[in-house]
Amino acid sequence: MGREFGNLTRMRHVITYSLSPFEQRAFPHYFSKGIPNVLRRMRACVLRVVPPFVAFYLVYTWGTQEFENSKRKNPAAYENDK
């Protein structure tokens, strides 16, 4: 069927280029270019993301407060009780 790995057939007219793993850097320019790029992207989309979260928070707090107030009894209804 075919040869085993390590003893494969030789292919002609195929050129491959590779870089040694010892010459590669794991995180090149991670702190000098990566973090500022993240901050730039966050600043660009903050006006698209933050307003819905603020609106949801305000609606949620208002709804929770109204729910708690609706569970309370009206003290004026029990003024004449002994």
From Swiss-Prot:
Transmembrane segments: 40-68
Xref: Pfam families: UcrQ (PF02939)
Disulfide bond annotation, renumbered to this chain: none
Residue(s) carrying N6-acetyllysine: K33
Localization in the cell: Mitochondrion inner membrane
Mitochondrial intermembrane side: 69-82
Example of a GO biological process term: pons development
Function of the protein: Component of the ubiquinol-cytochrome c oxidoreductase, a multisubunit transmembrane complex that is part of the mitochondrial electron transport chain which drives oxidative phosphorylation.
Protein name according to UniProt: Cytochrome b-c1 complex subunit 8
Annotated organism of origin: Ailuropoda melanoleuca
Protein encoded by which gene: UQCRQ
